[in-house]
Curated annotation (Swiss-Prot):
The gene is csnB. It comes from the Eukaryota. It is found in: Secreted. Belongs to the glycosyl hydrolase 75 family. This is Endo-chitosanase B. Glycans are attached at N86. It comes from Aspergillus oryzae. Chitosanase catalyzing the endo-type cleavage of chitosan, the deacylated form of chitin. Chitosanase may be crucial in the degradation of the deacetylated portion of chitin in the fungal cell wall. Chitoolisaccharides produced by the hydrolysis of partially N-acetylated chitosan are known to have many biological activities, including antibacterial activity, immune-enhancing effects, and elicitor activity. It catalyses: Endohydrolysis of beta-(1->4)-linkages between D-glucosamine residues in a partly acetylated chitosan. It is an enzyme of class 3 (hydrolase).
Length: 240
């Protein structure tokens, strides 16, 4: 799908949280308990609960997801990331750890903007660098700015892989993604979603990569709607 087509879709579609298809419901329940194909373990959820029980898992063919072995098996939380352009604007103004750049700033520049904006772009922080343990999703076929699926609050949302974590914590997404998932919790730069019930799914392979990313959009909902057709196709291909 090219940029002009994506923007046209964005203009005629409405914002909504998407219902979970049956296969994703089954995946959510089935893979909560145990990960058999652990790519890398030893991560935290950014807090003190459940220790270093969080891991990157490859049990779903064509995908990578976050999982925790604690409490009989669970997923992870959603801390708020405000890195990138306008990192101190709006509800990001109280972010204690925000940085002015994302990990994929150079890739983003190719699409005509200086960087992702956490207030606008629903992106996911996925992968860990600089500290041990590390995990690089590119090694398993994910590509920067590729579409990701997020199961949160009993619904499905779509975003892009937009940043990595410089430490060993997991479970982080942009402010705009947190607002899509948990509007009733009123997230901001210093407050996210604490429960470990969020399933982040990254897709491997070229089908998840957009030919043109609609980064020029003015509303988060327009951005999400514009990548929905790609996300739906990717999710439909997942098997529990």
């Amino acid at each position: 799908m090219r940029l002009s087509e994506i923007l046209a879709v964005a203009l005629v579609t409405g914002a909504t949280a998407y219902d979970l298809p049956d296969n994703l419901k089954q995946i959510y329940e089935k893979h909560k308990g145990k990960c058999s194909k652990v790519y890398q373990k030893g991560f935290t959820n950014g807090g003190h609960s459940d220790g270093k029980s969080f891991e990157y898992c490859g049990d779903i063919e064509g995908a990578i997801f976050m999982h925790s072995s604690a409490k009989g098996g669970q997923y992870t939380n959603m801390d708020v990331d405000c890195d990138g352009a306008n990192n101190s604007a709006g509800k990001c103004s109280n972010d204690p750890s925000g940085q002015g750049v994302t990990a994929f700033k150079d890739e983003v520049k190719k699409f005509g903007i200086p960087d992702l904006d956490a207030n606008l772009h629903p992106y996911i922080v996925f992968g860990n660098e600089e500290h041990s343990p590390q995990f690089k999703p590119q090694k398993y076929g994910m590509e920067p700015l590729s579409v990701m699926a997020v199961v949160c609050n009993g619904k499905l949302h779509y975003g892009i892989w937009g940043d990595t974590n410089g430490g060993t914590s997991t479970g982080e997404a942009s402010l705009s993604m947190a607002e899509l998932c948990f509007p009733e919790e009123k997230p901001d730069g210093d407050h996210g979603h604490d429960d470990n019930d969020v399933l982040y799914i990254g897709f491997t392979g070229k089908d998840a990569v957009l030919e043109r990313v609609p980064l020029e959009g003015k509303k988060t909902e327009d951005f999400e709607d514009s990548i929905k057709s790609i996300g739906d196709k990717l999710v439909a291909g997942l098997k529990a």
